[in-house]
Amino acid sequence: MRYVISLLLLIGGLSCSDANQPLPGPVGVFDTGAKTVTGQWPLATPSELGLSAESLLNLHNDVLQERYGWIDSLLIIRNGRIAFEQYYEHDYRAVYGDEAQTLGPLVVNSPSGPYNYFNAFWHPYFKDTQLHSMQSVTKSILSAVIGIAISRGDFPDLDTPVLSFFNVDKTAHVDDQKRAMTLRHLLTMSEGLRWDENIPYTDPKNTFTVMARSLDWVQFTLDQPMESEPGTRFNYNSGASLILGQIFLQSTGIDIEAYTAQHLFQPLGITNYEWKRTPFGLADTQEGLFLSTRDLAKIAYLYLQKGRWNQKTIIAESWINDSLRAAFKLNDELRTGYGFQWWSQRYQYQDKSYVAYLGKGFGGQRPIILPDFDMVIVLTGWNILPDKPFLHAEEAIERVLSSVIE
C-alpha cells in the first residue's frame, strides 16, 4: 500500500479557523521513520520552511478535482526537508481498460507486454508496487550515469564519433554528416538524424512509434538518414538515448543497470527499482526506469546539491553544470532549453527571471529543480492521451512558488 504523508502537516501551517474546516480526500499518516536525508527524508510543516500551507492545500484540492488530469504524486522538498507529499489513487484498469486490449501506437508488440502503455500491470506503476514509470526522465538519469562513468575513466570522450562503435558496412545512409556525429551530439539531441517525435505518440507516423515495432531499436535509429549537420539543430530523438545505452555497454563491458545500481543508486540508498528491456534485450535507456517518487526526488536533490550526497561527491560538479546548461535554447515563447538530457525552464517570480532544471517524462513525470529557492518539486502522473488536461512545468513552478512566504 502506497504511503501518504499526512495533510496534518498542512494543518500545522493553517490558522485555527482553517484547520477546523474538513480536509479534502483521505488523510494519511506520518512516516515516522523519516529522519535523515540519506535514508528517509526529514519532515517539516510548510510554515517551518517558509511556505503557505493554505496555498499548498489549494493546489492539492485542484489535483483532487483533476484540474490537471491524472496526477499520481506530488512531493515538495525545501531546505532538504519534505514540506508536502501526497499520493493520488486512480483506477487505471478502469480508465484505460478498453484501449489496453487492441494493438495501436500506445499498445506496441503485445497487449500483455511492457510497451502497452494502457496496461495497468506495467503502467504507470510496475506490478502494483510503488515503482512509477519514469518514461523519459530515464534519459536524465542516463546522463547522470554517463557523467559518473566519465569521471571514473569508464566512458569515452564526448567528441568520439558514434560510428566508431558500430559496423559501418551494416549501417544505412552513411555519409560525411553521419560520420561527424559524436557522443556529445547524442547527449544534446543534435545528432542530425531524420526523426519526428514532435507529433503525439498516439500518431502511428511518430518515428518513436515506428521504432518501437522494430526488433533492434538501436540499429533502427542509426539507420535513419541525416537531415542536418550534427551539432547545429536540436531535434528530440529518444533513439539517441538508446544509442548511448548501447555505447555504454560496449565501452564499459557492464550492463548499465548494474553500473547504475553500484555507482548511483547504492550511494543514494535506492534499492527498489525496475528497468525495462528492449525487444533486443538492451536496458531501455530512453524510458525504461521505474522509481518511487521519493527516490526520484533523491536524483533531483543530488543535482540541486551539485552532485554531492551525504558529504560525498557522487557526480562531478562540472558534469552537473554541463548537463544543466542549455546547449540549445529552444522555444522563446515557452522559454525552454536542453543540455545533456536535461531541460531548462526560464520563469518569472516577483518580476525577476530565474531558471529551473527538470526532466520530462511522457504522462507527466517531472523532477523540477529550483536552485534559487533551495527546492525540489516532483510530479508523477499518467496523462498519456493528448486531449487530457496537464500540469506543465511552468505552471507547477508558479503554483508552488505562490506558496513562498519567506
How would you name each of these model-derived features?
Residues 4-12:
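Sec-dependent N-terminal signal peptides
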Residues 14-126, 150-155, 214-215, 227, ...:
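N-terminal leader/targeting segments and the immediately adjacent pre-domain N-terminus
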Residues 57, 80, 103, 113-114, ...:
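Active-site SXXK
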Residues 86, 96, 100-122, 160-163, ...:
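Short, charged, amphipathic alpha-helices and their helix-cap/turn boundaries
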Residues 122-123, 128, 152-193, 223-226, ...:
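Active-site helix/loop module of the DD-peptidase/beta-lactamase fold
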Residues 240-247, 287-308, 365-382:
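Active-site-proximal alpha-helical segments within enzyme catalytic domains
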Residues 270-273, 277, 321-378:
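Active-site Gly/Thr loop motif
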Residues 359-406:
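Structured C-terminal helix/loop/strand segments within mature extracytoplasmic catalytic/sensor domains
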